[in-house]
From Swiss-Prot:
<keyword id="KW-0456">Lyase</keyword>
<dbReference type="InterPro" id="IPR002028">
    <property type="entry name" value="Trp_synthase_suA"/>
</dbReference>
<feature type="active site" description="Proton acceptor">
    <location>
        <position position="44"/>
    </location>
</feature>
<dbReference type="GO" id="GO:0005829">
    <property type="term" value="C:cytosol"/>
</dbReference>
<comment type="function">
    <text>The alpha subunit is responsible for the aldol cleavage of indoleglycerol phosphate to indole and glyceraldehyde 3-phosphate.</text>
</comment>
<comment type="similarity">
    <text>Belongs to the TrpA family.</text>
</comment>
<dbReference type="InterPro" id="IPR018204">
    <property type="entry name" value="Trp_synthase_alpha_AS"/>
</dbReference>
<protein>
    <recommendedName>
        <fullName>Tryptophan synthase alpha chain</fullName>
        <ecNumber>4.2.1.20</ecNumber>
    </recommendedName>
</protein>
<dbReference type="InterPro" id="IPR013785">
    <property type="entry name" value="Aldolase_TIM"/>
</dbReference>
<keyword id="KW-0822">Tryptophan biosynthesis</keyword>
<dbReference type="GO" id="GO:0004834">
    <property type="term" value="F:tryptophan synthase activity"/>
</dbReference>
<dbReference type="InterPro" id="IPR011060">
    <property type="entry name" value="RibuloseP-bd_barrel"/>
</dbReference>
<keyword id="KW-0028">Amino-acid biosynthesis</keyword>
<dbReference type="GO" id="GO:0000162">
    <property type="term" value="P:L-tryptophan biosynthetic process"/>
</dbReference>
<dbReference type="Pfam" id="PF00290">
    <property type="entry name" value="Trp_syntA"/>
</dbReference>
<comment type="subunit">
    <text>Tetramer of two alpha and two beta chains.</text>
</comment>
<feature type="active site" description="Proton acceptor">
    <location>
        <position position="55"/>
    </location>
</feature>
Amino acid sequence: MNRIEQQFKKSPAYVAYLTAGDGGLERSLESLLALAKGGVNILEVGVPFSDPVADGPVIQEASIRALAQGTTLHDVLTLITSFRQHSEIPIILFTYFNPLLAAGDKIYQQMKSAGVDGCLVVDLPVEEAAPHLTACKTAKIAPILLISPSTTQERLKKINEHGEGMLYYVCRPGTTGVRATLPENFPAKMNQIKSMTSLPIVTGFGIANRKMAAQALQYADGFVIGSLFVKAIAEGISKNALTRLAQSLNPHYPNLRLITPFRKKTF
């Protein structure tokens, strides 16, 4: 049983995403530790990529900045290795397929050695993922697979067969980014999916406040907040304020005044 599975046995998942290398690797390490201190219990560490088609403007711009500073996949693994000196909470590598392909076959064992627990390849459909799935399982890394509102029952069966650790439900079409509410069809879709899988389901793409997170947890086993944290980091939020922001978004944390870290609204 890996750390992802252990986490779901303890409590619902509060998942936070950040783009590695945005602001420098030292800043990324500081931010990961601040999020963990703020109650996040699974971290998604994004590998910067030049064509992040699944991401909205906030994360696209973070990738551009990280790449401009020379951040590579191997730098991201070094970051995770450093984080592992301080924390054992689960880490999912969030990446596009090209960086893995360019790194070669040894990258999966290097990921495992760095302390990666799961790998989510956002642009790799399950129908084309056999080599990746095999490499993950050989290295004892959970392949985290995506499902969406348009996923058919037949395809969901295949995803359920090959996924491990959890499934990631993209609750709306389009790209990542902050939204005001969950989609109206969210409860029905979640109930349909949960009737077909025993894997925990986390949901993301748009969750940006405590109320939405609480609503998500009525049906899902966890929620993901990404763009809000990426934007806060880009705006220069301090590590202590980032911890308080993470706490203020957690439905299971004592009610806090929502921290507003932005100098201006750009959503």
